[in-house]
């Protein structure tokens, strides 16, 4: 990745966190909103591969751990690093994905991220089940819808160039 590519990715990183903090609050429905940070990690990993996805996943997760009041410092960093690596591996070694599979990968990545976070923080089984039903599934659906729209806009812009 060139210096311009790193700068562009860093600006996308900052924009994802800004959108998570501002637009994400406006888009909440019944206290459920999209996760722009996961959308960022998946898009970077799909475009640039596992190493870059791992790097930005760790940076985004660590930033979330520091930014949000969390008792388990590092839980987001580990979970998002795993997501960035896994999504990057899928893209590099198997196939180049068009829009519907990318959206499916985004949904799977969201579930993997939440499950690893719950596993790392050591939440009890009944708490995880409740969170899964009340938070993870609705947020995943919302994130997939917003991510699908963003992937469509990005792919449309890319094909016109």
Task: Describe each PLM feature range.
Residues 1-161:
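Terminal, non-globular segments
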């Amino acid at each position: 990745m060139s210096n311009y590519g790193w700068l562009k990715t860093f600006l996308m990183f900052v924009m994802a966190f800004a959108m998570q903090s501002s637009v994400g609050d406006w888009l909440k429905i019944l206290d459920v909103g999209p996760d722009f940070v996961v959308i960022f990690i998946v898009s970077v990993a799909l475009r640039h591969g596992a190493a870059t996805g791992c790097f930005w996943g760790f940076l985004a997760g660590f930033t979330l751990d520091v930014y949000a009041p969390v008792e388990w410092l590092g839980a987001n960093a580990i979970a998002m690093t795993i997501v960035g690596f896994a999504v990057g591996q899928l893209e590099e070694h198997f196939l180049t994905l068009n829009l519907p599979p990318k959206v499916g990968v985004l949904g799977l990545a969201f579930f993997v991220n939440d499950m690893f976070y719950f596993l790392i923080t050591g939440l009890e089984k009944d708490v995880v089940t409740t969170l899964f039903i009340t938070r993870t599934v609705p947020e995943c659906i919302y994130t997939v819808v917003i991510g699908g729209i963003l992937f469509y806009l990005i792919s449309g812009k890319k094909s016109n160039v």
